[in-house]
């Protein structure tokens, strides 16, 4: 999956790997209150019984803190943290090397687990359930099965596409956790915390302006904060207020709701070329010259959350909110069109 470079893309970039702004404990972590409360209970219970924590599956859009929470869990459990991703584990031997090097209670984090090789996934089942590796050594008549006992570990996995996980794999996670987009108030706290860490003078209105445009995503909030700091240090005295934040983000083509040029192209294309829809995802992908999965996983979730598009049986359709945001007049029969489309289901 690839997408044109975007300031507000929720995927990791080089600068995002900087641990400076990441919270180190559950107490420092802002947002996802129910998730934090539940994880605290599960962690304390596992420590009290001196057992490995049950396997955890984080589900949600990119940039919401899945990796950060996995690191925090290992830290709070007092165990080692090992990290990899689904596409990196190409063969059974790669997984075996990871698992046999784990110590008792260690946390193994697998990002993008929905992209795991099916042959590797088969090896993972007994490892998760029985803490054993079943490997075939040799070939042909000389082949034999070997069982290797593993230390009891905790697998923490992350996915943006739960539907791509097989049922057997999904069912082996005892603690499924769904992460949701953050509120503006939560993002404002995250921005303030980041500014303190960066020793950056930040006014209340400046923090709010950055939070409003962060698309409900902490990773984007941190990235916008850094870019606004650049503008403030060059074009001003280093202090960030609403005017500086607005000027910087407007120049970076991030509008008041966090939409960028690609989002507006998406909405404008449906409005101007297809009368507001419905239009199929393949047509949209061709029109934007972007891959379908990138549109479904990265562009559309936030637009749906903001009430700008609807997914109907016949394709994507703009809502009245989208027409207003574009400054265009919606079709007079928009409401009836939407009713008719959903009656076709």
Curated annotation (Swiss-Prot):
The gene is: ruvB
What does this chain do? The RuvA-RuvB-RuvC complex processes Holliday junction (HJ) DNA during genetic recombination and DNA repair, while the RuvA-RuvB complex plays an important role in the rescue of blocked DNA replication forks via replication fork reversal (RFR). RuvA specifically binds to HJ cruciform DNA, conferring on it an open structure. The RuvB hexamer acts as an ATP-dependent pump, pulling dsDNA into and through the RuvAB complex. RuvB forms 2 homohexamers on either side of HJ DNA bound by 1 or 2 RuvA tetramers; 4 subunits per hexamer contact DNA at a time.
Kindly list the biological process annotations in GO that this record carries: DNA recombination; DNA repair
Where ATP binds, per the record, is at: 21-22, 63, 66-68, 129-131, 172, 182, 219
Q: Whose protein is this, by species? A: Mesorhizobium japonicum (strain LMG 29417 / CECT 9101 / MAFF 303099) (Mesorhizobium loti (strain MAFF 303099))
Q: Which reaction does it catalyse?
A: ATP + H2O = ADP + phosphate + H(+)
Enumerate the UniProt keywords alphabetically.
ATP-binding, Cytoplasm, DNA damage, DNA recombination, DNA repair, DNA-binding, Hydrolase, Nucleotide-binding
Protein residues bound to DNA: 292, 311, 316
Q: Which GO terms describe its cellular component?
A: cytoplasm; Holliday junction resolvase complex
Chain intervals for the UniProt region annotation (Large ATPase domain (RuvB-L)): 1-182
Matching entries from HAMAP family are given as:
DNA_HJ_migration_RuvB
What sort of enzyme, by top EC class, is this?
A: hydrolase
The cellular location(s) given in this protein's UniProt record come to: Cytoplasm
- Give the EC number(s) listed in the UniProt record: 3.6.4.-
Q: Where does Mg(2+) bind?
A: 67
**UniProt GO molecular function:** ATP binding; ATP hydrolysis activity; four-way junction DNA binding; four-way junction helicase activity
Query: Could you tell me which Gene3D superfamilies the record lists for this protein?
Result: 1.10.8.60, P-loop containing nucleotide triphosphate hydrolases (3.40.50.300), Winged helix-like DNA-binding domain superfamily/Winged helix DNA-binding domain (1.10.10.10)
Q: What family does the database annotate?
A: Belongs to the RuvB family.
Query: Which residue ranges does the record annotate as region Head domain (RuvB-H)?
Result: 256-345
Query: Upper taxonomic classification of the species?
Result: Bacteria, Pseudomonadati, Pseudomonadota, Alphaproteobacteria, Hyphomicrobiales
Q: Does the keyword Acyltransferase apply?
A: no
- Pfam families documented for this protein: AAA_lid_4, RuvB_C, RuvB_N
Q: What is this protein called?
A: Holliday junction branch migration complex subunit RuvB
> Quaternary structure?
Homohexamer. Forms an RuvA(8)-RuvB(12)-Holliday junction (HJ) complex. HJ DNA is sandwiched between 2 RuvA tetramers; dsDNA enters through RuvA and exits via RuvB. An RuvB hexamer assembles on each DNA strand where it exits the tetramer. Each RuvB hexamer is contacted by two RuvA subunits (via domain III) on 2 adjacent RuvB subunits; this complex drives branch migration. In the full resolvosome a probable DNA-RuvA(4)-RuvB(12)-RuvC(2) complex forms which resolves the HJ.
Annotated segments matching region Small ATPAse domain (RuvB-S) = 183-253
Major place of localization? cytoplasm
Q: Does the keyword Mitochondrion apply?
A: no
**In the UniProt entry, what is the domain comment?**
Has 3 domains, the large (RuvB-L) and small ATPase (RuvB-S) domains and the C-terminal head (RuvB-H) domain. The head domain binds DNA, while the ATPase domains jointly bind ATP, ADP or are empty depending on the state of the subunit in the translocation cycle. During a single DNA translocation step the structure of each domain remains the same, but their relative positions change.
Task: Name the domain of life.
Answer: Bacteria
């Amino acid at each position: 999956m690839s997408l044109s470079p975007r300031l507000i893309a929720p995927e990791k970039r080089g600068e995002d790997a900087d641990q400076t702004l990441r919270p180190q404990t559950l107490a420092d972590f802002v947002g996802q209150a129910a998730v934090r409360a539940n994880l605290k209970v599960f962690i304390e219970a596992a420590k009290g019984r001196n057992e490995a924590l049950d396997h955890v599956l984080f589900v949600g859009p990119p940039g919401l803190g899945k990796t950060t929470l996995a690191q925090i869990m290992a830290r709070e459990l007092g165990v080692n943290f090992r990290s990899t991703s689904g596409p990196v584990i190409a063969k059974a031997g790669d997984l075996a090397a990871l698992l046999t090097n784990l110590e008792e209670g260690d946390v193994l984090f697998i990002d993008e687990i929905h992209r795991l090789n099916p042959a590797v996934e088969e090896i993972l089942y007994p490892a998760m359930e029985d803490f054993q590796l079943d490997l075939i050594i040799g070939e042909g008549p000389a082949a034999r099965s070997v069982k290797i006992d593993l230390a009891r570990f905790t697998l923490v996995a992350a996915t943006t596409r739960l539907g791509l996980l097989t049922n057997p794999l999904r069912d082996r996670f005892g603690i499924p956790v769904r992460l949701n987009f953050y509120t503006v108030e939560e993002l404002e706290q995250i921005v303030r915390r980041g500014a303190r860490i960066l020793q950056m003078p930040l006014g209340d209105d400046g923090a709010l302006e950055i939070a409003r445009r962060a698309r409900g995503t902490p990773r984007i909030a941190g990235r916008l904060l850094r870019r606004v700091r650049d503008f403030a240090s060059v074009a001003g005295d280093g202090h960030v207020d609403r005017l500086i934040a607005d000027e910087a983000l407007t120049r970076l083509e991030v509008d008041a709701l966090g939409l960028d040029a690609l989002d507006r192209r998406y909405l404008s294309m449906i409005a101007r070329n297809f009368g507001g829809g419905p239009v199929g995802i393949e047509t949209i992908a061709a029109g934007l010259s972007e891959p379908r999965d990138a549109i479904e996983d990265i562009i559309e979730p936030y637009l749906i959350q903001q009430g700008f598009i609807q997914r109907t049986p016949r394709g994507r359709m703009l809502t009245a909110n989208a027409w207003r945001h574009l400054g265009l007049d919606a079709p007079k029969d928009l409401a009836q069109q939407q009713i008719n489309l959903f009656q076709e289901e």
